[in-house]
Amino acid sequence: ISQYITKAQGFFNQAIYWTKVTVEVSKQIYIREGLAPPSVAEIQQVYQGLYKKALEFAAQPKTSADGLIKVAKSLSKEEYLRFGAYFIQIVGLFSLGEIIGRRQIVGYPSFGPKEHHH
């Protein structure tokens, strides 16, 4: 039993450490990017805009797709790098959540009876 307690304490200490690291990195990103929580009016404005854009896209998908391509071509190298970094962060956090949820890096645990292959 003491072996399991020692192992659990190790996992707990690692979880605390990485939580603190994540909080500190998040604070630095929050400050450096000048982030702030949105106001209710900003949230409403964004969702109303998204709704209008979705309706426009549904009505004229070809025109909307051409506009999207035009915007993509107008982005600078710095913007592509910044958005690429955001994408990598999102994928990394999603993957971390998947790993935590599965409790292993690859595949899903099987809780049923084990099959024997001959």
UniProtKB/Swiss-Prot annotation:
Signal sequence residues: none
UniProt-listed GO biological process terms: proton motive force-driven ATP synthesis
InterPro entries, sorted: ATP_synth_F0_gsu_mt
Cellular localization per UniProt: Mitochondrion inner membrane
Keyword Membrane: yes
Claim: Transport is one of the keywords in the record: yes
GO MF term set: proton transmembrane transporter activity
Principal cellular location given in the protein's record: mitochondrion
Keywords annotated in UniProt: ATP synthesis, CF(0), Hydrogen ion transport, Ion transport, Membrane, Mitochondrion, Mitochondrion inner membrane, Transport
Name of a matching Pfam family: ATP-synt_G
Top-level taxon of the source organism: Eukaryota
One cellular component (GO) term of this entry: mitochondrial inner membrane
Described function: Mitochondrial membrane ATP synthase (F(1)F(0) ATP synthase or Complex V) produces ATP from ADP in the presence of a proton gradient across the membrane which is generated by electron transport complexes of the respiratory chain. F-type ATP synthases consist of two structural domains, F(1) - containing the extramembraneous catalytic core, and F(0) - containing the membrane proton channel, linked together by a central stalk and a peripheral stalk.
Assembly mode: F-type ATP synthases have 2 components, the catalytic core F(1) and the membrane-embedded component F(0), linked together by a central stalk and a peripheral stalk. The central stalk, also called rotor shaft, is often seen as part of F(1). The peripheral stalk is seen as part of F(0). F(0) contains the membrane channel next to the rotor. F-type ATP synthases form dimers but each monomer functions independently in ATP generation.
Family indicated by similarity: Belongs to the ATPase g subunit family.
Protein name in UniProt: ATP synthase subunit g, mitochondrial
UniProt source species: Pichia angusta
